[in-house]
C-alpha cells in the first residue's frame, strides 16, 4: 500500500494513521538527487534528506523514475542513462528501505516518443496503447531474454542487477 505525499509534515500521519506501508520519497531524496545531478546543489544536501525521515526510513520508497517523472535518459533530465548511475547507488544503497525500478529504467528507456495524449515530454505514457521499444526488444517475442537489446542496454541492465544485489 503506497502513498504519494508531497507534504513531508504529513508523512507520519499517512504511515501511522493511514496505515500505508510505503511513501514515495519524492520531495526528499528524489528531488535532491535530481538537483545534485543537474548541478543545482551540493551532494552534501543529501544528508538532510535521510535525517528528516530517519525514524520512518523503512517506510520510504526510493525511486528515480515513475509514471509522473521524466526519464533519466530523456533530453529533459540527464540525457544519458549512464548519468543516473550515481543516483542509483545512493538511492539503492544509502538505507535498507525498498527501491523501485520503473518500466525499462534499467534499460535506459528515454521516454522521448511523441505518443498519444502526452507528446514528447521525457515520460513514458501510461494511458495509451503504445509499444515502448526497449521493453519490446527485451521481451523478444515472449522469450524475455533481452537478445534484441543493444550492448549498452545489456550493460546498463547488468549494472542495475549488480547494484540491486548489493542492496
Give, region by region, the residue ranges found by the protein language model.
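Aromatic-lined carbohydrate-recognition surfaces of secreted/lumenal glycan-active proteins
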Residues: 1-11, 24
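Short, hinge-like loop/turn segments at secondary-structure boundaries
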Residues: 17-22, 118-119
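Loop/helix patches that line or flank the sugar-binding groove of alpha-linked glycan CAZymes
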Residues: 7, 31-34, 44-47, 54-66, ...
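Short, charged, surface-exposed secondary-structure boundary motifs
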Residues: 11-14, 30-38
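A short acidic (Asp/Glu
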Residues: 12-15, 112-114
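A polyampholytic, Gly/Pro-enriched intrinsically disordered region
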Residues: 22-29, 46-48
Amino acid at each position: 500500500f503506497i502513498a504519494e505525499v508531497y507534504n513531508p509534515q504529513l508523512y507520519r500521519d499517512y504511515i501511522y494513521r493511514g496505515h500505508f506501508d510505503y511513501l514515495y520519497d519524492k520531495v526528499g531524496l528524489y528531488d535532491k538527487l535530481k538537483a545534485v545531478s543537474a548541478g543545482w546543489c551540493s551532494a552534501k544536501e543529501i544528508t538532510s534528506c535521510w535525517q528528516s525521515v530517519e525514524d520512518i526510513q523503512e517506510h520510504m520508497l526510493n525511486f528515480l523514475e515513475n509514471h509522473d517523472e521524466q526519464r533519466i535518459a530523456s533530453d529533459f533530465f540527464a540525457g544519458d542513462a549512464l548519468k543516473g548511475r550515481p543516483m542509483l547507488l545512493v538511492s539503492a544503497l544509502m538505507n535498507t528501505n525498498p527501491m523501485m525500478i520503473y518500466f525499462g529504467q534499467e534499460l535506459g528507456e528515454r521516454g522521448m516518443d511523441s505518443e498519444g495524449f502526452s507528446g514528447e515530454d521525457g515520460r513514458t505514457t501510461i494511458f495509451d496503447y503504445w509499444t515502448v521499444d526497449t521493453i519490446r526488444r527485451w521481451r523478444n517475442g515472449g522469450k524475455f531474454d533481452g537478445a534484441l537489446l543493444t550492448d549498452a542496454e545489456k550493460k546498463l541492465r547488468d549494472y542495475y542487477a549488480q547494484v540491486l544485489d548489493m542492496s
